[in-house]
Amino acid sequence: MPGEFGIPRLRLFWTLLIELSMKEMQNKWLALVNVFAASRKAGSIWKKAAVKLENAGIDYKARFTGGKYNAMELSRIAASEGYRKFIAVGGDGTIHDVLNGIAEYVFSSDTEKVRLSDFTLAVIPVGSGNDWVKSAGVPRDITSAIDVIASGRTGVQDVVRVSIYESSDDAVQGGNAIAESYMANVGGVGLDARVCEIVNRKKEQGYRGKQLYVSALLYCIRHRVPVRARVLCDGNQIFSGKYLSMAFGVGRYSGGGMRQTSLAVMDDGLLDVTVIPDIPLLVIAREVPKLFTGNFHKVGVLTQSRCRSVVILPDSASDAEPVEVDGEVVGRAPVKMEVLEDQLNIVI
C-alpha cells in the first residue's frame, strides 16, 4: 500500500521539479555563439564578451554552434527546454538562424499557448555585415551592446513569414508552401538574391568586408538579365513587367550597408517594398550611390509600396528568380511574404 501512494507523490515531485527548472530557464539568457563568425575569430571575441557579461551581472548559459544553420537547431531545442531569452553572438546569419529556430518551435503543430511575444532576442554583433544591428539601432561595440542587455531596455519588431510555392496559383490562393523561412530584417528577389549567392560563396572561401558586397553588386549589374513578374501588395497589383531586382523589409539596411528599403520601420506592422524595373545601365550607374546614402527612395523610376503581405509571381518558369531572406537564399519565386500578427521582443 505505501508504494501505491509513493508513485503519485514521485510523479508530483518530478512535475514540480520540471516546472521550477523551466521557470529558471525562462529568466536565464542563453547565448548562442557562432564560432565561425568574423572569419572564425568569434571564439576569441566571445571569451572577452563572456567576462563582460559576468561583470555586468547577467545570468546566462552559452552554447556553441557546430556548423552552418546549427544555431537554428540549437535555438529550437532551447525553446522547447523552456528558454525564452536569447543572445545571438554572431552576424546577420546567426540572428536569422536563432529567429527561425524560435519560430519553428512556436509554430510547430505540437506547441500550444506559446507566442513569439514570449521571446526576447539580444545581439552581441560579431560579423562582417551586421545589417540587423544597424536597422535596430543596437551598438556595434561589444561592451556597449552588453550594457544595453544589462539595462533591460526592450522594444518589439515585426517578423515576416516567407513562403516559397510550386506555382503562382498556390501563392495567390494560399496553397501548401514547399519551403518556409522567417525574416528579421530585409529580403529580396532577382539581382538582390544573386548578389547574396555570390557573397555567401565568397564568404565560404574566406573573403570578408563591405567591399565584398559592392563587388558582387557591380558584377551582377554588369551581367544583369531582366525578367518578368507581377507584384501584389495586400492583393492589389502594384507592378507588372520586366524588373532587375526587388527588396522587401521591415529593416532599412542590407548587403553590408545598402538601404533598399530606406524608410522601413521595424515595428509598424508593414513591409516596405521596392521594385527596380528594367532600366538602362547609365541610369543604374547614376542612382547606385543612393543605395548607401539613404536617398534611394527618392529615385523616380522605382515602384514602392507598404503593405502587410506581398506576393511575387514570375511570368514563366524561366522568370523564376532566387529569393533571399536576411542574406540567405531560400528558394525561387513564386513567393509570398506576410507580416505576422505577433511581434518579437528585442533588446535595443
Walk through the language-model features, giving the residues of each:
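Glycine-rich phosphate/pyrophosphate-binding beta-alpha loops
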Residues: 188, 192, 247-260, 329
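Catalytic core of DAGKc-family lipid kinases
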Residues: 56, 104-244
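Short glycine-/acidic-enriched loop or helix-start segments at secondary-structure transitions
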Residues: 97-99, 133-135, 257-258, 285
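ATP/NTP phosphate-donor binding region
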Residues: 14-89, 96, 100-107, 143
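ATP/nucleoside-binding phosphotransfer catalytic cores, i.e., glycine-rich phosphate-binding loops
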Residues: 233-235, 240, 259-260, 265-348
